[in-house]
Amino acid sequence: MAEKFTEIRILDNFYQTSSFYPMPVVLVSTMNENGSTNLGPYSLCFPFVVTGGEKHSMLLIARASSNTALNITRTKVCSLNFIPDKKKYMKNCVQLGFPGETSEQKMKNSIFTLQPSTRSGSPTNGLTKFPDIVEEAIQVMECTWDDSQPLPPTPTSAESSYFVLVIDKIIMKQKWKDSLFKGKGFPRIPIDFGFRDNIQFWFSKHSKPYPIKVPGSKASSVETVLYACTRFDPDIKWEKEACAKIVKVPNVFLKRVIGGVVKAAKKEGITIITPEFMDKVQDKRSSEKN
């Protein structure tokens, strides 16, 4: 007999008090008023704008009175440092995240190594430099707060600030850049289950990621895709083998994909879509592999 569901009362911080919700662990580096770097660990940090333009961004939720929130509000810049899953790093994150301490008090206990930002150009808002980044990180997103977004930095209904952070630059260690390009291998990144029992934070390791292919039954026929492609723009011709490259694209996204390929072809002065051109378009990193 199947086990029944039972209701849980929804409390503040429901993601850790009323549910099990896996989260990332991100060290956010910001600039203090004296020019030093502050590190604050956060887990409520998620992709926000993911497609449709150049302003790809992350959403960060932080306590409004925290060093991190105050620094971002003042300087508008920060860096998101994704650190590897090591127990000593998690212990230090718990120390760095303890509320009520000044940045100077917290940073005395930091075991992380800071190095200069990799951003080019001059910082604004009276800064002499950008926030440092964490040398031990697997990858870093260097960001600028988009304060034009309709998210108030300090909602009246909560003690939190919501920051839409436009990603100016992503850097990562060469090993993981190679893995990203090859589509093989993943870094061991910690999983946070939050503060529970009013005593301790809970973290988890993850096992090796595994792939699951899209079912072949979901694919469209080549003839169906060819028909859609030829109708899209009469000035652009498609080889049948090129259409075969996108038969597994869900129908709801097919028009968008075809439009993207046609746009890329016209940009390069191409009038016939070949399988080779499709491979180039589908490889979003082709320009970085030369």
Model-derived regions: residue spans:
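Active-site-proximal mixed secondary-structure blocks
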Residues: 1-41, 46-226
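Non-catalytic accessory segments flanking P-loop/AAA+ NTPase cores
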Residues: 222-290
